[in-house]
């Protein structure tokens, strides 16, 4: 039992090293490519794509994730599946924690959004939404929500990571965020998701459950 705990601890530390290394590499790289990505988005605008991306951005916010998580948690609880009830609850908590973390950082940094005409990109503490670009709250919340599912069950959750990726792209397409805003948000989301996934218990037998685990 001790060896198993030590193995899980070591594996957990390795994941934190990976997340930290990704942040060190990806955030500076994305800052470098911000201007290029902004120019690409401007060049590839179309009315149809913009309408679609606006819809994705609108329905990809945290309230929609919370409603989905609550519905799934209630279904799992009703079906008697303790493991999935806990997973869906962890997804909800991760979504909330990532959203709060992103909010604190964006208010503290005061980064201007791409559609704001200003020479100063970073302006210090600001409450105005026009200067709350870094990081993307939509992306952080969605990534935390679905990455928690992926950490809990990669076979089920891996494909759903396409959802936060689409939401992140939509936020850039509608000129709400820079590339580095969504990259930083995704890293926050993954970190929060892993933090929550570490606190989930192992598989639980549910003899009366109608859901396979």
Predicted regions: what is each one?
Residues 2-70, 106-128:
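N-terminal transmembrane-helix/juxtamembrane module of multi-pass inner/ER membrane proteins
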Residues 3-17, 118-213:
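Membrane-embedded catalytic cores of phosphoryl/pyrophosphoryl-handling enzymes
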Residues 16-17, 72-103:
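Interfacial segments of alpha-helical transmembrane regions
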Residues 24-30, 96-101, 164-176:
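Aromatic-anchored segments of alpha-helical transmembrane domains
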Residues 26, 90-94, 98, 102, ...:
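Alpha-helical transmembrane segments in multi-pass membrane proteins
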Residues 34, 49, 72, 97, ...:
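Alpha-helical membrane-inserting segments
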Residues 48-49, 81-86, 153-159:
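Membrane-helix interface segments
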Residues 68-79, 142-150:
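Hydrophobic, aromatic-rich transmembrane alpha-helices
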């Amino acid at each position: 039992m001790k060896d198993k705990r030590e193995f899980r601890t070591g594996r957990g530390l390795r994941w934190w090293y990976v997340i930290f290394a990704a942040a060190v590499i990806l955030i500076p790289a994305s800052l470098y490519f911000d201007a290029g990505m902004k120019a690409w988005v401007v060049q590839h605008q179309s009315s149809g794509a913009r309408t679609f991306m606006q819809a994705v951005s609108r329905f990809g916010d945290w309230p929609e994730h919370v409603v989905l998580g609550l519905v799934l948690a209630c279904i799992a609880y009703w079906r008697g599946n303790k493991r999935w009830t806990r997973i869906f609850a962890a997804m909800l908590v991760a979504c909330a924690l990532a959203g709060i973390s992103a909010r604190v950082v964006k208010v503290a940094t005061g980064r201007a959004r791409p559609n704001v005409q200003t020479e100063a990109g970073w302006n210090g503490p600001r409450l105005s939404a026009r200067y709350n670009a870094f990081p993307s709250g939509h992306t952080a919340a969605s990534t935390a929500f679905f990455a928690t599912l992926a950490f809990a069950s990669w076979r089920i959750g891996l494909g759903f990571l396409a959802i936060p990726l689409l939401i992140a792209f939509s936020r850039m397409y509608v000129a709400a965020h820079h590339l580095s805003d969504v990259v930083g948000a995704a890293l926050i989301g993954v970190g929060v998701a892993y933090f929550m996934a570490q606190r989930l218990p192992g598989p639980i037998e549910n003899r009366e459950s109608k859901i396979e685990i």
